[in-house]
């Protein structure tokens, strides 16, 4: 969508990607990335031309939710939206955006919970007791481990996190990738 690779363009691409997931309007996008309404509309149109499946997903999700009053994440967990058919445009619009977003955010949260459970079990066995899971921030997990064990523990973390959705109940055609950084403290990891 945006040809060059400057930091400003990276920010714009991220704003468009996340904005669409959250149901951003052309006016909201224009304000966020500091372009005209017309340019924002062109970005959104180009995005949906390049990724028509996303628009299909959004429309299908809203249609399903209007009929059923709920949506499911990839694990089947339901989120209810009782006001999705409200006569008030603002209420209805908010519910539509939330219904589109709930399966995405809910699925991501569930994947993280499953990864944390698996890692907690794996790291609590006798030979991994020196490693502690300290913190979760969105889609990141922070661990503390002795330097001499970092390589071995890194492999365990990558293996467990990337395979969290490979089971009898859940199998996805798109692999989960895991980026892992090591450092002396949290500030050096980014």
Positions of the model-derived regions?
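Single conserved hydrophobic/aromatic residue that forms the stacking wall/gate
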Residues: 1-11
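Conserved phosphate/anionic-ligand binding catalytic regions in large, soluble enzymes, centered on
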Residues: 16-29, 102-105
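Short acidic (Asp/Glu) and glycine-rich catalytic loops that position anionic groups and cofactors
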Residues: 21-27, 37-41, 90-98, 134-138
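Extended, well-ordered alpha-helical scaffold/bundle regions in very large, multi-domain proteins
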Residues: 22-60
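Catalytic palm subdomain of template-directed nucleic-acid polymerases
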Residues: 25-38, 141-158
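Hydrophobic, well-ordered secondary-structure elements that form the walls
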Residues: 29, 112, 119, 139-141, ...
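C-terminal polymerase-core module
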Residues: 49-101, 144, 148-190
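Active-site palm subdomain of RNA-directed nucleic acid polymerases
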Residues: 111-137
């Amino acid at each position: 969508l945006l040809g060059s690779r400057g930091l400003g363009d990276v920010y714009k691409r991220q704003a468009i990607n996340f904005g669409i997931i959250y149901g951003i309007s052309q006016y909201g996008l224009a304000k966020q990335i500091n372009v005209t309404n017309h340019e924002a509309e062109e970005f959104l149109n180009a995005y949906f031309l390049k990724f028509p499946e996303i628009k299909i997903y959004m429309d299908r999700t809203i249609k399903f939710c209007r009929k059923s009053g709920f949506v499911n994440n990839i694990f089947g967990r339901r989120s209810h939206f009782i006001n999705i058919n409200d006569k008030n445009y603002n209420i209805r619009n908010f519910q539509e955006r939330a219904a589109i977003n709930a399966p995405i955010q809910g699925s991501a949260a569930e994947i993280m919970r499953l990864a944390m459970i698996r890692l907690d079990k794996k790291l609590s066995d006798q030979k991994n007791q020196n490693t502690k899971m300290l913190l979760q921030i969105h889609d990141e997990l922070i661990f503390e481990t002795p330097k001499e064990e970092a390589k071995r523990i890194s492999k365990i973390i990558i293996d467990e996190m990337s395979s969290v959705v490979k089971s009898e109940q859940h199998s996805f055609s798109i692999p989960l990738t895991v980026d892992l950084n090591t450092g002396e403290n949290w500030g050096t990891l980014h």
